[in-house]
């Protein structure tokens, strides 16, 4: 995060915001700047990626599903907008520790004898390490003592859209992001790689809520994609993983996606629409649409 803050200081904070008497390494200034940068970055990343996904990837026919809530998209957005600033507070405390040199983040690839190999290995280890921790944290959030107050708000969205990706209770959102912050305090990681991975995991979080269940056949047994995560939203006790199915298989919580068996929400909506169309046809209303141009859905 120091790379982002350095750029923000150089181009904005130092020349336009803070007085010259307030040095860039002042801890109070750094805290304020990190809060601004973290929140601004989170909102930009969320709205940019979720909006693109919603309009160009998300299957809008899913909005006809009976478990899709009234005004759901706007509710997902409002929930996220309210939660992100609260999530940023503990997040910034960890960024501050990184910024002040308490982590194992490094600048120079040459710090390691096999620098590029180490860099590539660190990417793989980051993904597997964080996937493991997120699995157990996520599964723990389903415990009856904490689920109702902390994790249930995210499960309101049975048929999620990309905008539901960050619609968490603040404690839930921070806990599930915690593994990404723990890693650089335990293992060496290049600063640019860390920043790139941090963006990647947020984009991935959006992608597993996008309703696009296409995964190459050869990867289906290994990748925890949108189909897996949609089943998690619908059935609760399965597919807790973030990227891979490994820990769900080890923990006995893996469920083969119902969508891969023709029993998922897409199939439900398709069958429902066909039945409604046939019903209209039988009543002499074949091809007639109502209201806003869509067939009404069953209550």
Curated annotation (Swiss-Prot):
The modification Phosphoserine is found at residue 253. Residues 124-252 form the Fatty acid hydroxylase domain. Its cofactor is Fe cation. It is a multi-pass membrane protein. The keyword Mitochondrion does not apply. The chain crosses the membrane at residues 32-52, 79-99, 117-137, 186-206. Residues 280-299 are annotated as: Disordered. Its main location: endoplasmic reticulum. Pfam families: FA_hydroxylase. It catalyses: a Delta(7)-sterol + 2 Fe(II)-[cytochrome b5] + O2 + 2 H(+) = a Delta(5),Delta(7)-sterol + 2 Fe(III)-[cytochrome b5] + 2 H2O; lathosterol + 2 Fe(II)-[cytochrome b5] + O2 + 2 H(+) = 7-dehydrocholesterol + 2 Fe(III)-[cytochrome b5] + 2 H2O; 5alpha-cholesta-7,24-dien-3beta-ol + 2 Fe(II)-[cytochrome b5] + O2 + 2 H(+) = 7-dehydrodesmosterol + 2 Fe(III)-[cytochrome b5] + 2 H2O. It is found in: Endoplasmic reticulum membrane. A motif (Histidine box-2) lies at residues 151-155. Keywords: Endoplasmic reticulum, Iron, Lipid biosynthesis, Lipid metabolism, Membrane, Oxidoreductase, Phosphoprotein, Steroid biosynthesis, Steroid metabolism, Sterol biosynthesis, Sterol metabolism, Transmembrane, Transmembrane helix. GO terms for biological process: cholesterol biosynthetic process via lathosterol; negative regulation of ferroptosis. One of its GO terms (molecular function) is delta7-sterol 5(6)-desaturase activity. Its EC number is 1.14.19.20. A motif (Histidine box-3) lies at residues 228-233. The histidine box domains may contain the active site and/or be involved in metal ion binding. This is Lathosterol oxidase. It comes from Mus musculus (Mouse).
